[in-house]
């Protein structure tokens, strides 16, 4: 076998008859499989050992030669070669067909490749191939047309008319083969090229298609007649196995049945030909042979599929490749792996961030070879076999060895569905008792895991390199930030939030208020002895707290609470003391009002201070982000563990419980509802008098009930007790929100009916009072819809992710700087008055293209090609700059990928992205993973203002990425100028908008009901929307440039996600949109050898033009093409990637005719052939490094952690 890592590329072509013979080890002549008495394969049958190799290792069929020493000998009695049985997976046979047979892929595919080559309609081809008509192959001197079709009757009449032998006409695949042999590719191509210069319309389209196929044959060196088979390959027997079941019966692959039919019919045809049987019988047999081969290659493609027992269609060769269960997706892209296990997960609150608990039984099985090696190395037993027995017996000595083996050996934990790269992370295993894996509570959010019965899989990286990569790149403590937006993904949740919230609460007048302590120990002692409470406001000497105080603050008394002293004790010393949950406190330090001036009375000062709100979930997130920015991963993960421990400890001490009495009831609820009832009555009266329409009445009623619910909500918030446990949970962000609270204590409000329309009758009760039977019934609609929506959404979102990954999987950071001379001008994204994404957010982590100057002073804020940090972005925006030209993925010149400068920082690390980062896959995951959080609905605007549906949520994202015609499409102008008039035409129920510009004027018809975006006198640019709604990107591309379309698509995707509260970095969407617009269609080939109408990559097009321009020729012209992600995936240069995505047979048919080469640039194609992927450390530039010895002495600070959680530094000298 060739070493898979030595491949440069992989090519697929049509197989010539000689090629098939060269693969074959012998002809299969009989349809038999195995002898039912001896269970040995039959000679010359489908499982013959002479052809395919021995069934047992190193043993011939008759048993004369056994053992490896006879390797390579062919037995003189039975003719079987002595070799491994594994060759039965690779040796092929063949069947010599007694009549040529057309290959169904090339005849039946769309478009029919045979039809285009011969310039015949698929209908005519079918009649000829299946013996319903004759085709003229050589008219000789008769007036018959070449390739004309005639029925049996017409044929006989012509024979009578012109005489026998006066012309040649045949039927069946043989006729087609003769015609294909006659095709002169060069001449046909020349004729078509001439024809294209004048042709137009349908004729032109057909000529372009035909030219495409003929050119493919010509360039690839494939011969058209190879589309008709004279010899049929038989795949190796172990790929179509036959196994004995318990009851002595056999289960065999369907392929054996299909091959058997072919052989039977082929043998019968041979006999009929020998006997000189009548023509009609031979024809019938040939037709049946053709149908049998069709069924073998692609059963069900033509006519009714051949069925097996229980009328189940048999699985043909094509079906073996297709779909989720096919070869590509089931076996090549998704293999099962050894050294893995799965179990239920349980919480491990005592673990460190980088640890996970592995049950002993699991660990011993997973690390068995490592343990066995160590047992032998220690001379406990002499050989591996004995070591294996020792492990399987569960000897006492193995446990200590296991402990040592797993030390420093990371394992990978994965939870399905793996929606983004944080779904697989590495941990150091810790042995535990029990049978459940233990998971650190903070990584749950990344995995989206909870402990209600979730299961996780565990994998062991084996090689040293794999362990090193797992430890350096995948350790859970490294994954602090979410790759989609660069915000921390490991924020404390639930109990941890609640504990820290309770700890940092303040209360006026608690015991011991105004006490002053010299240091933290004293405060803690007072707390333990009951002199003060956690929430008591006290004073403490600032110099006892190791914090970055100013000179002025150093020797003062700080007013804080005991809880906050404990909270700050776990924070890094360099961080300011956190007294109030504000950004100013976090970045600049404690405000002056909390310090006691000399001579002031502490109690008076405390009374004047307002009560601070405690630290909530989002404040903790901000603290973590700030710490990450300052200290990076090691310190952050240590802090997270301390936050977790503190949170759990204090939520346990707080002992929050919820009882029914904790749900307050709003006093004046009855009055609020009574008022609303009266208003609804007034609205109904207005409707009855005909003052308003039914739609207006419906909108007014639902708005009234919404207002009532909001009023109740406001009352609840105003009257809530900050120490109420439900309020604390809600306010801290630990669990629940105001909507849940108001359903418990206010009113449930309006519900949706099964058809999605909001019902006018609201549910007036809340859960505290209890619902009536009718209300209960109403509320079940909503609950049921919620469940079905979630289920549908999950599937939709998963499929979207799959398509996104497929289209961008080969986008990798390939170089440092592409040297582009273009940039992208960006501003903030807005929708009307609403800010969608600010300029500051968009600038952060990108490189500038041009110098940015202060608009007033003209001072340079940042030079060209420099990284914009968070602080720089803030400085630019604060200076009043409104637009900046940055380096963007849209304008990157790198082939097959992106360069570092156009991409910017890697959001997952906060540092500049590295060469080799698979940014395409990360982008796809970042857009797909939040897909489940988006809504499914298409909103009705209530039928009053407009009659268009506005698509939002997941359907809108799919609409954008598939480049579909949007629902509620906006009318756009092709003219730049002024809107001169808007006329209404009552007869056609339309409006006409007139735009006049310097280049001409445009008249646009818009529906009567559409909402106008422009007024008379407005200035509009090309491609501007005249009405509300979504612009169709393909129309926009026709009137504007590529960059405008890309910018529009980016903004549209951001609008959907941001409106649902999901933040995604621009660069991820840029990567995706760029993949949709990579291709151009050739309009005029000029002097290049490109074909008109061909779809090709923009880089290949530029290369072809460059060569022609250098030699002084006329360059080709082309126009950009916007493709949806599904189409873009299928049009990729890699046939392996496209075939494993969708439409497998079509992709392979096309690739074979073109003799396509796959250069293995993407990730999928390398996974398929089992080669290391060309991203990260798999890139060629990293694989081909030569290690070199360096003799310098290097001093490294090693950080080790002591049992008390504090760290020491030792200097280690490396020789």
Curated annotation (Swiss-Prot):
Zn(2+) 2 binds at residues 818, 892, 899, 902. SUPFAM superfamilies: beta and beta-prime subunits of DNA dependent RNA-polymerase (SSF64484). Zn(2+) 1 binds at residues 60, 62, 75, 78. Mg(2+) binds at residues 450, 452, 454. Its EC number is 2.7.7.6. DNA-dependent RNA polymerase catalyzes the transcription of DNA into RNA using the four ribonucleoside triphosphates as substrates. This is DNA-directed RNA polymerase subunit beta'. It comes from Streptococcus sanguinis (strain SK36).
